Amino acid sequence: MTPEQFNTFCASLPHSTHVVQWGGAQVWKVGGKLFAAMWDGDAPNAGITFKVTPLAFELLRDQPGLRPAPYLASRGMKWIQRVSAESMNDEELTLYLRQSHELALARLTRAQRQALTSSPAP
């Protein structure tokens, strides 16, 4: 998935916002909660990072082309990073990105979710 495809897909998810941070990463949030990030190029952490359920983390963590996300997974959080498309194609990746968005949205307070739904999506 190219950076353009990644950004276009993430932008299509309701109430998602984009920032560039952490040394040039394309970072996507919903209600201020991170749901996906992409580091491009030759960075040691190059790849697409997304939040997963505990079960998905156990299933995906040792698959070729996937790994526990640096920093996030080392802190006990359930985040996966796709570094190549060996065992997860772009179509599957978009399903996980959508689920990551839903997981982040679910972590918002009721008031935060209401504020998002009562204001127009950016």
Language model segments and positions:
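Charge-dense, helix-prone N-terminal extensions
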Residues: 1-122
